[in-house]
């Protein structure tokens, strides 16, 4: 048995299962915190993932509804709650995901009250040799954000990717990815621009790389990122490198973070294969 993906909404999961049944592929749903979709015939995994990518692009396509009618599951027979916004956040995010989100919000509020420079004096990458033993600085630069759009964009991705890693692989794995990527992406960025930078984007890019490659090489890990999203990440890096949008971007942190995530995913998936 191979787990293909998970859906928060069991009706959506049932729609995909019904459609694959019309294609001659039998999937099953197991209800845990979410609706986990499992495949018995692992030889069909690549085909199922390709169909899943198309399904996720437009789950409301009439062909999927038609498949549910054909299978007789338009009512799904499943009972599920309608989650309000904060309940949906809580459903996907583990404790580490929440702690980092709250820390970023608290730091952002402090920056609005005290000013960016005052907070950066305490949290920025060491900007003076006398500060090199203030070890928190090698990580806390990731908590600082300089605009509402900056923090919303990063926290949305952090919640989506970090939450998935924590739920599937544990809090320890998320902590390791976060600390290593914050340290190395910060080191590279300060070589590019000096110590005055901030943001969680280096960690977010590490999570993008990790989730995508781990899902490709080790589907049984239960994490997955559409190829379209990793292509978007690469386009965003290129746009930032050539300053196509006229915005200040931490290009060094983005590239380093992505490289860290890919490297960690390669090692972890290699170890997972050896254990089989």
Swiss-Prot record:
Species this chain originates from: Shigella boydii serotype 4 (strain Sb227)
GO terms of biological process kind: proteolysis
Cell inner membrane in keyword set: yes
Chief location bin: membrane
Protein name: Rhomboid protease GlpG
Subcellular location: Cell inner membrane
GO MF entry, a single one: serine-type endopeptidase activity
Membrane-related topology note: Multi-pass membrane protein
Transmembrane portions of the chain: 94-114, 142-162, 169-189, 192-212, 229-249, 250-270
